[in-house]
Amino acid sequence: DKFLSGNLCRCTGYLPIKNAIKNMYSYKSDKFSKSKVIRLLKSIKKTDTVIKKNGSKFFIHYNLNSLIKDYQKISNGHLLVGGTDLALEVTKKRKDLKNIFYLGSNKDLNYVKNKNNNLHIGSATPINDILPILENIYPTFAKMFERYGSEQIRNTASLGGNIGSASPIGDSLPVLIALNSKIIIQGKVKKTLLLDNYFISYRKTKLKPNEIIKEIIIPIYKKNILKCYKISKRIDDDISSVFMAINARIEKNIIKEIKIVCGGLAETPKIAEKAQKFLLNKIFNEENINEAKKIIKREFDPIDDMRASKNYRTKISQNLLERFLNENNKIKSTLY
């Protein structure tokens, strides 16, 4: 089921797909062994490549310097890693993308390092390469990625792609903001930006033309609670109606630190500044959460669309605060 999730079928279900896989056992095995295929692939010499056809160019770079050098020369370049968002520009909007820069093979953008209580993640690192480390540090964040996309998607999708596309319902973005993550942007000069300050408006960011996201820096909070709540019509492989991430430190039932970030309630992932300000240094109880629910209702003005109504989104955001209380409050709540 894990590997079939990328073949989600609303008509026939999984059974015919499973039966087809069982029938494959009658076929002859591949003449190549797995180890031999890996060895052959690794033997291919990695040199920067430009594929040209019909006036379009497809760039493949293996280091950051050569990528930046070529990317600075192109005024209409498109960055590609997993392509789950960029591909829609072609299939849905019928755009002709002339200059594509593939980042998935760039060694300077593919890494995960744990140093000085921070995770340093290359912007093109596949989600599945990050999961083993996240499972030990932020298990709820890692668990969220199981619903974020199928195994096939997670093998190519990246955090840099999520941040670059700037979707208001990108599931990783509220979590990264809640964790006070930073990004390193590389262009003619290198700069570091708090992700809170990255978004300007719908699909607009502070990333300038010919700049790329090089690295994501995620602080490691050892004493905090991190919760990731994804609300969607289907459990797996579905776009969120509402997403809420909460990063909090609670000591002796006092909220010493809290950050609440929502996706799907505004044109960008947005911090619930008024609600979290009210809760800071308050007792973690039903009374204060109920007041925060009133505040968050006034703080956001979501839209009606095909995924959810305005009223539904508002109510869900309130309910998620309530859920956070019930999951983490050591003093029994009377809500249920």
Regions found by a protein language model. Name each.
Residues 1-336:
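C-terminal structural segment of proteins
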